[in-house]
């Protein structure tokens, strides 16, 4: 059966310097085969984290991924205006993306 990715919340608004937590739940265990992506309007998705917790090259440590099995979390600390974007989780089994979380940063 296809793995269903459930991502929450759909949107979140926090001030500059704040912290955002995004959760992704899968309908069956995917071990740590989960990636997180950031997408800004008119741009392709940018990979942030792979294997649940490993930062992609050049991604600041303000971004942190955790979890395994069916429950995963992306935490963005010390929010900057440039972090305003939509964030997606994806199983690296290639079964599609979560529904996305729009992050609004209040400056």
UniProtKB/Swiss-Prot annotation:
SUPFAM superfamilies: Immunoglobulin. Residues 25-35 are annotated as: Complementarity-determining-1. InterPro entries: Ig-like_dom (IPR007110), Ig-like_dom_sf (IPR036179), Ig-like_fold (IPR013783), Ig_sub (IPR003599), Ig_V-set (IPR013106), IgV_Light_Chain (IPR050150). Residues 58-89 are annotated as: Framework-3. Residues 51-57 are annotated as: Complementarity-determining-2. Residues 90-96 are annotated as: Complementarity-determining-3. Residues 36-50 are annotated as: Framework-2. The keyword Secreted does not apply. Residues 97-106 are annotated as: Framework-4. The sequence of the B4-type C region is also given. This chain was obtained from antibody to the specific carbohydrate of group C Streptococci and was isolated from the serum of a single rabbit. This is Ig kappa chain V region 4135. It comes from Oryctolagus cuniculus.
